[in-house]
Amino acid sequence: MADQIAISVLGAGSYGSALAISLARNGHPTLLWGHDPAHVAELEQDRCNKAFLPDVPFPADLQLTADLQQAVQAAPVLLLVVPSHVFGQVLAQVKPFLRPDTRIAWATKGLEPDSGRLLQDVAREVLGDEMPLAVISGPTFAKELAAGLPTAISVASTHDDFADDLSLLLHCGRSFRVYTNPDFIGLQLGGAVKNVIAIGAGLSDGLGFGANARTALITRGLVEMQRLGAALGADAKTFMGMAGLGDLVLTCTDNQSRNRRFGLALGAGKDVNTAMAEIGQVVEGYRNTKEVHLLAARCGVEMPICEQIFKVLYEGKNPKEAAIALLSRDKKDE
């Protein structure tokens, strides 16, 4: 790959903006696309994302557009950073404008709504089996990445050369380390399941259960992640890395996590809608909980923590009763 390669980042929220800022700082021609022309005009005028990253100015050469055709045709690499529930929709909109050399990656963490399918399956259904695909995942908060604080992630792809190219594209020796990982399934799965467990960690803390309970929940949540991964053919080692344990610990323990804050609000007695409104941004874990529930049921995998969180969010179960249900399960070996 050349020293510089053009890339279009699709999704101008906090994480999409942070990735675009990092890529532009790396010297790569970067175009940031947002679906709302008024929002993009505001970003262009302010030269920063005032809503989410007000203290981080856009690099001078970072370009912005609300024209999807322009964004897709401007670069051979597309990086989708959109909520999981619109992932397939955005790919369908992208498809008519694809270049012959287009390769597609995503930083979206989640599964397909109403089916629980992996995003790779959604992408292949829309784009066919020949399109090179990749996923980036790991413990990253947008504010810290945009501020240039030390960060590490992993990238996996259907094509080894694409994974290598993406790692070179994203890697910044000063602050951003990128590892390649051959486990395409595991990286996708870790990002979805950790969101659910993070809601559980917030619930536990909101109920005042303390550090012991939070740590037990993280540890057993990792087991559930590995269990589901094994059923889908993922490598168990992946879940001990950036996209598994790393992302899980980050989102379960730091209040920058929307999923954790959502759980905290629920644990404090607020209902789902009120808690969601307080966050003011997409809480991916809310939808991920249903998606993981569907996927686990289809695979016949027992995930008791994720199941109790599903009951709280979608069946109105009292959070304290859900915690009691977990603690009162039959004795078993670790």
UniProtKB/Swiss-Prot annotation:
GO biological process terms on file: carbohydrate metabolic process; glycerol-3-phosphate biosynthetic process; glycerol-3-phosphate catabolic process; glycerophospholipid biosynthetic process
Q: Which GO terms describe its cellular component?
A: cytosol
Name the Gene3D superfamilies for this protein: N-(1-d-carboxylethyl)-l-norvaline Dehydrogenase, domain 2, NAD(P)-binding Rossmann-like Domain
Spell out the molecular function terms from Gene Ontology. Answer: glycerol-3-phosphate dehydrogenase [NAD(P)+] activity; NAD binding
Signal sequence extent: none
Q: Which NCBIfam families match?
A: PRK00094.1-1 (NF000939), PRK00094.1-2 (NF000940), PRK00094.1-4 (NF000942)
Q: What is this protein called?
A: Glycerol-3-phosphate dehydrogenase [NAD(P)+]
Originating organism = Aeromonas hydrophila subsp. hydrophila (strain ATCC 7966 / DSM 30187 / BCRC 13018 / CCUG 14551 / JCM 1027 / KCTC 2358 / NCIMB 9240 / NCTC 8049)
Q: Which gene codes for it?
A: gpsA
